Amino acid sequence: MITKPNRNELRKRRHLRVRKKVFGTPERPRLNVFRSLKHIYAQIIDDTKGHTLVHASTLDPELRGIAKGANKQSAKLVGELIAKRALEKGIKDVVFDRGGYIYHGVVKELADAARQAGLNF
């Protein structure tokens, strides 16, 4: 019997393929995006140490009442917030990791908002 592969399993495989090439350094950390059905999460990670330097999501107290759901408006707010927090810590250049998702919709909106707020990638 043929079984249809799970969408999330396929995404995880794509993400592993991408992660072979995308690596965050202390000078240029990795901006990782994860989206669930209800929320959007973004982290800036130094892969040499394995530490998260900055994070933002729709669950943050700053966005809790404003951002509702995992839509484009929420993604834009999360992108602006992660860029603001990164610039406060002195991080300007990052490597974008789309997390195995297609660069479209919510992921693209988050990336564009982070770029407009001052991150370079």
UniProtKB/Swiss-Prot annotation:
<keyword id="KW-0699">rRNA-binding</keyword>
<keyword id="KW-0689">Ribosomal protein</keyword>
<dbReference type="GO" id="GO:0006412">
    <property type="term" value="P:translation"/>
</dbReference>
<comment type="subunit">
    <text>Part of the 50S ribosomal subunit; part of the 5S rRNA/L5/L18/L25 subcomplex. Contacts the 5S and 23S rRNAs.</text>
</comment>
<protein>
    <recommendedName>
        <fullName>Large ribosomal subunit protein uL18</fullName>
    </recommendedName>
</protein>
<dbReference type="GO" id="GO:0008097">
    <property type="term" value="F:5S rRNA binding"/>
</dbReference>
<dbReference type="GO" id="GO:0003735">
    <property type="term" value="F:structural constituent of ribosome"/>
</dbReference>
<comment type="similarity">
    <text>Belongs to the universal ribosomal protein uL18 family.</text>
</comment>
<dbReference type="GO" id="GO:0022625">
    <property type="term" value="C:cytosolic large ribosomal subunit"/>
</dbReference>
<keyword id="KW-0694">RNA-binding</keyword>
<dbReference type="InterPro" id="IPR005484">
    <property type="entry name" value="Ribosomal_uL18_bac/euk"/>
</dbReference>
<keyword id="KW-0687">Ribonucleoprotein</keyword>
<dbReference type="Pfam" id="PF00861">
    <property type="entry name" value="Ribosomal_L18p"/>
</dbReference>
<comment type="function">
    <text>This is one of the proteins that bind and probably mediate the attachment of the 5S RNA into the large ribosomal subunit, where it forms part of the central protuberance.</text>
</comment>
<dbReference type="InterPro" id="IPR004389">
    <property type="entry name" value="Ribosomal_uL18_bac-type"/>
</dbReference>
